[in-house]
Structures are given as C-alpha cells and as structure tokens.
C-alpha cells in the first residue's frame, strides 16, 4: 500500500470510510462526489487526477502502463453490466496498490477508458481496478 497525501487532505489515501471520503473530496463536482460516496458511479473523470498524483509521488510517468491503480475491495465491487449498480459504499475500503497490467487479454470495462477488470483472488467475483490503460492496448 502506498501512503500519499491527497491534495488538500493530509494523511494516507487508504483505509475505510476515511479513504473513500478523501477520494470523494478530491472530486470537485458535488454531484460527482455524491456518486462516488453512494455508489452510483465508478471512480472516473476527475478522480484520475488522484491517480496521477499517486504516479508522481512514486516518480512514475502519468501515461502508459501506470503501476498505480485504485482497488475497491470485495465489499465494493461492481459488475459493469446494465442493471447491476456499483456497490461502492462510504465504508468500502479503497487502497492505493501497485500492479503492472500488461495482459492484453484482460476484459475491458465499459464504464470508461481508464477502468478495467482483473480477476479477484477470492474467487467468484471480480474486483474493480481503476488506472491508466494505454490507448493502443
């Protein structure tokens, strides 16, 4: 896990509802912030700026294969299917983790160009990862 100061909010970006709150606070638009907190939308758009900040904190470029992704645990996964609403709760654990994604066979999400699926090690469901995906992939 990476400890990093989210702009405007001192402390670790991960951990419980506090982590979710810090990520949501980093999204400037109030309506978008509500979506992040109440689970009606995946982290995307302005939230990418948070991922970029994590990249810079690690000394990595903010393009291409980023090793920084946001992981929403099995309490907050979503199916990415019509009629299946994201279950991202304020208490969902959001961690900044490192993962190099180089498998072109990974199924792409349809919720945005910066989201993609990786299999969950717990089995049965998939965890949602959000980060940079090269346009050429």
From Swiss-Prot:
Protein name: Uncharacterized protein B-137
Composition bias type Low complexity, residue spans: 1-10
Domain of life: Viruses
Region (Disordered): 1-23
Biased composition (Gly residues): 11-20
Organism: Human adenovirus C serotype 2 (HAdV-2)
């Amino acid at each position: 896990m990476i400890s990093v100061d989210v702009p405007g909010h001192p402390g670790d970006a991960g951990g419980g509802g506090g982590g979710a709150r810090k990520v949501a606070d980093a999204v400037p638009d109030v309506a978008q912030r509500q979506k992040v907190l109440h689970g009606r939308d995946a982290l995307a758009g302005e939230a990418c700026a948070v991922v970029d900040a994590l990249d810079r904190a690690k000394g990595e470029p903010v393009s291409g294969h980023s090793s920084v992704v946001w992981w929403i645990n099995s309490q907050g996964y979503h199916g990415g299917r019509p009629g299946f609403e994201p279950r991202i709760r304020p208490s969902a654990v959001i961690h900044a983790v490192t993962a190099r994604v180089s498998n072109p066979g990974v199924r792409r999400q349809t919720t945005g160009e910066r989201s993609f699926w990786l299999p969950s090690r717990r089995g049965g469901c998939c965890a949602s990862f959000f980060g940079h995906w090269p346009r050429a992939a």
